[in-house]
Design a protein with these regions (language model features):
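Non-heme Fe(II) oxygenase catalytic core, chiefly the N-lobe of the double-stranded beta-helix
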Residues: 2-210
Length: 210
């Protein structure tokens, strides 16, 4: 039986006892999947996981998304994004967002593995967009229900290219903007699996609201 410790009333659960060095059986995979649907974000503390095991775990949820159009990848694993922040490459994202909403098909989930973390700071924060919707007054729910948002690669366009960017990074951004263009999505949507209503817009990728 899967051991899940609830973190907050709205979001988050810690799962213990998973050994990523061995294949995860189907029953455990299914339990993790349903824990993710229930808690929306789940954590595996002090888990030792290789890039190969990372991909194998991702495949247990379905087909892995194509390589990220902008960020570099882990050597030998093009489907794993490598994010490295230091004094030369400071963080370029500091805004609430849902990953890749500019794509035609939004990914089901993202799996993050922290390899090196600072003693202070460096936090990644999560929020529940369904809990945020539930707390809106009824007149605001009705108002937002008639609106749509146009999503594009705005955050990358605005923050990824800087004076220190290479010609290669600028070209990758250019190619990705042409490739993905824009996608129009309702501000309020229902999750296709859980049926929960949630807010699907964010300052990182929404160009404007119509």
């Amino acid at each position: 039986m899967l051991n899940v410790k609830k973190i907050t009333p709205a979001i988050g659960g810690i799962i213990q006892g998973i050994n990523f060095s061995k294949p995860i059986d189907e029953a455990t995979q299914d339990a993790i999947y349903h824990a993710l649907l229930e808690h929306k974000v789940i954590f595996f503390r002090n888990a030792a996981i290789t890039p190969a095991a990372h991909l194998a775990f991702a495949r247990s949820f379905g087909v892995i998304d194509e390589p990220h159009p902008i960020y570099p990848h882990v050597d030998g694993y093009e489907n794993i994004v490598k994010l490295e922040n230091n004094e030369k490459t400071p963080p370029d994202t500091n805004a609430w967002h849902t990953d890749l909403t500019f794509k035609q098909h939004q990914p089901f989930a993202s799996i993050l593995v922290a390899r090196t973390v600072p003693d202070i700071g460096g936090d990644t924060l999560w929020s529940s967009s369904s809990a945020a919707y539930d707390r809106l007054p009824e007149h605001m729910k009705a108002y937002l229900g008639d609106l749509e948002a146009i999503h594009d690669m705005g955050d990358f366009r605005n923050n990824f290219v800087s004076d220190t960017s290479t010609e290669d990074s600028r070209q990758r951004l250019n190619d990705a903007i042409v490739r993905f263009g824009q996608n129009v999505r309702p501000l309020i949507q229902k999750h296709p699996i859980t049926g929960q209503t949630f807010l699907n817009f964010n300052e990182a990728f929404v160009n404007h609201i119509v």
